[in-house]
């Protein structure tokens, strides 16, 4: 397998990419042996556009309802919303989209991207992306703790939507100064 990867996959995947910047993550969580209903109930993915932002913002295709807080499809989306709202509330931008990308088996996101759509101040998008990595614990455990996701709130999200309701912790803007130190 290593020979096939070296000879065929890597040259195509890395074409035009500087080798110093390339990171190839191949099954970092190890052997995957559990499947079927024991590993996945199949109860997600029914309301993707309704549960997110419609066609206004892109999303990775992962559903929220039916997943617990350890699944970054759900908790990562909540954390991205939380960070974006706090960036705007702190005055770093008038408009903001935060993208978090995770790889299976990796605790930290493989990508953190802040896009202020040109509405940011002196701290450019790259600067804000770096500050977000430093200011927030973006591991699943860190997100669960920050947003108190072990509380029984999920019936309310399924019935009334996941975003735009101030009673959810990811809508809180009380920590808008968290980024200022970075």
Label every model-predicted segment:
Residues 1-3, 44-69:
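Glycine-rich, flexible beta-strand/loop modules in the N-terminal catalytic cores of phosphate-handling
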Residues 2-48:
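Accessory "access/gating" subregions that flank catalytic or transport cores
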Residues 3-4, 45, 74-78, 82, ...:
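Conserved active-site and cofactor/substrate-binding residues in soluble primary-metabolism enzymes
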Residues 11-28, 90-99, 140-147:
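Flexible, glycine/charged-enriched surface loops at secondary-structure junctions
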Residues 37-57, 100, 112-119:
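Short beta-strand elements
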Residues 67-91:
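Alpha-helical support elements that line or immediately flank enzyme active sites
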Residues 95, 102-182:
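Internal helix-turn-beta structural module
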